[in-house]
Amino acid sequence: TQIVVASGAPVLYYYCTNHNYMGGTANTVSETVKANNGYWIDTTSTTCTITLPSSPSKGDQIILVDYARTWGTNKITIDSNGSNYQGQDDSYNVEYSTNGEVLNIVYSDGTKGWIPQDDDEVADAPVAPPTQKGIFGFGYISSSTGVTNLVGSNGVVATDTAAVGTAKRDLSATNYGGDKAIFAFGNTGSMSNTRNLVNNSGVVQSDASGAGTARQRKSAVSYGLLGEAIFAYGENGGKTNGRNLVNSSGVIASDVSGAGTARTNPTAVNYGSTGQAIFAYGQNAAAAYVNISNLVSNTGVLASDGSGVGTASQQKAATTFGSSGQALIAFGVNSGGSQVNTRNIVGNNGVVASDVSGAGTARYDLAATNYGGDKGIFAFGTGSSITNLSNLVNSSGVVASDTTGVGTSRYSLAAAGFSYSA
């Protein structure tokens, strides 16, 4: 985020986190500030109390800036230190809890005290570059497997990489931390909540203990601008709408009550420009196929059901494409049991468009991911037979005809994007 200040404006200092290399005095709990200075306030690890000068003079100015865009998680509290704040005495609580906020306060007099001149969220937050590579992993043939296949920035699928994690099927995967990926949940012979992180070189890590209820047939997608993700829906004995958030380090949180119709096999994908996402389609508790959708805000809040568009179906796949925040949901199986290759565009406002005739072999229980920054790929799946075919998606959202497959034919797998480097 760029902050432009006029000549003679307060100098910005850096406080409230341990970054001594920047020259500031580290303090993660509280900081007494001086008049006519500016401060970067980093609340990544904890809340911070800002104590204002005890004897301010008229015209004194202080600027406080949310360094890590984390005030929404860990707020700051203003201690006016005996002076009034917006006309209220020091006994009033003054808190700021909006990510990306910039607070510019000026001291007026003994009556009004400190008055905010600006109290705005910085909207033009830096946006991470799109990922360049992808990974398909795990799945089922005649038994579960743990093999993976990398996808280069040119859309070429590599041969099998030997399994590292426990073989499983009906799992989910998503990007996290900006340039990394995570596979989690699924069925290893019984339902599982273990996870396998993927670093930004595409190396799959060994099994790590999971969090949340062991489930299968969920879906997952990243959200926001801080490298976070969400796993939602699925089943364990019964269908659920529960969700598990993932932080930017790949740690999965415990179960949280969800929103929308409980179901299995939805499809999830990003849309928009600031980290929104959508879950769509699936099979509900009455075993009916649905075309409803649920939007995810860039803070990870899952919305209630939206009106359905397109043919009710499940076991579809989705990828982003282009540079204007659009996505594509395609393939799957409909309520009549027929596999399809139709596609539905998701606009940058999260609206799902009607069915459009597709390309490539109709199939379901496949996976998809973005690659090359603005393109996508659908691969593997089952229909008339288990396959390893792939279909590339160009930056305009056009699905290409079949590409001869590479890697072990399988279905019930998952895929995600990773790496900022081509």
Question: Which role does the model predict for each range below?
Answer:
Residues 33-36, 72, 128:
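A short, polar/charged loop/turn motif at coil->beta-strand junctions and beta-hairpin connectors
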Residues 17-21:
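Beta-strand-rich extracellular modules
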Residues 1-15, 44-124:
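Acidic, glycine/polar-enriched metal-coordinating patches/loops
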